[in-house]
Amino acid sequence: MSTVVEKSGEAKPGKVEVGVKLRGAEKVARIPVKIIPTEELPKKPDWIRVRIPVSPEVDRIKQLLRKHKLHSVCEEASCPNLGECFSGGTATFMIMGDICTRRCPFCDVGHGRPKPLDVDEPTNLAIAIADLRLKYVVITSVDRDDLRDGGAQHFADCLREIRKLSPGIQLETLVPDYRGRMDIALEITANEPPDVFNHNLETVPRLYRSSRPGSDFEWSLDLLQKFKQMVPHVPTKSGLMLGLGETDEEVIEVMQRMREHDIDMLTLGQYLQPSRNHLPVQRFVHPDTFAWFAEEGERMGFKNVASGPLVRSSYHADQQAHGNKIG
């Protein structure tokens, strides 16, 4: 198993050119803790079974994404549900490029200095969604700390263009934390709100330094609460990955904090290490434990809890938004 240790006395990596995507060891070399690579990835338990993403529908959606120069988080983040979702004719779109300004060592999305925004992306995204005849779409993004509003206006532009071509569609946004730009970002978002506002806490506060460098647990909670105060009729949603070293007690505490901040929906899923250079899996949470978390969440008052090993933030998001049980 790989380990995480504090760095001391190491030379800082050089500046990255615009448009160069760093992944794996190059990416995690730029965080405040050192990831010692795993010698061998842990064997997954029997309850984690993933469909191989091979079907005509998978190929069709990938070709459509390339045609319109779009990205799906399903591919970029190596989501284990890619085959199931693509085969069902759905996808979670990732806007603002495929290079993130953050360096989270659990995530497989590339890091670097992103290119300027593609002004045609809102239109191209709307056309692609109309071509696919989708009824529920999740839109997420890389972090864009280089933008004065964190990319909030680009999100709003995308929602507006999609609604023009697909009247009646439901849109969920999975947004970054808008670090240092919360007020302007939320003002923009409130003027063109999604149907579900999602921002993931990802893990428990104790693990933020090693798991989410550059992010702040309390800031993320405040983002969700302030949006809810501004647009009270729109459901808010957040999620955690389990298996990074948290305890069950810490998970329950975070769930309670979420409810204190008026978060309506919750997702809980198993962290799966993308490569030997990413954060190690500390435990595989049993399905019975996920079921227990779901029961506790419902008791706390969440409107919907999706809790299971392969649950991800946008996994069957349409069903969760409609109140169906996911897990």
Curated annotation (Swiss-Prot):
InterPro entries reported for this sequence: Aldolase_TIM (IPR013785), Elp3/MiaA/NifB-like_rSAM (IPR006638), LIAS_N (IPR031691), Lipoyl_synth (IPR003698), rSAM (IPR007197)
Keywords assigned: 4Fe-4S, Cytoplasm, Iron, Iron-sulfur, Metal-binding, S-adenosyl-L-methionine, Transferase
Binding, [4Fe-4S] cluster 1: C74, C79, C85, S314
Pathway info: Protein modification; protein lipoylation via endogenous pathway; protein N(6)-(lipoyl)lysine from octanoyl-[acyl-carrier-protein]: step 2/2
Entry binding sites for [4Fe-4S] cluster 2: C100, C104, C107
Cofactor note: Binds 2 [4Fe-4S] clusters per subunit. One cluster is coordinated with 3 cysteines and an exchangeable S-adenosyl-L-methionine.
Designated name of the protein: Lipoyl synthase
Organism: Pseudomonas paraeruginosa (strain DSM 24068 / PA7)
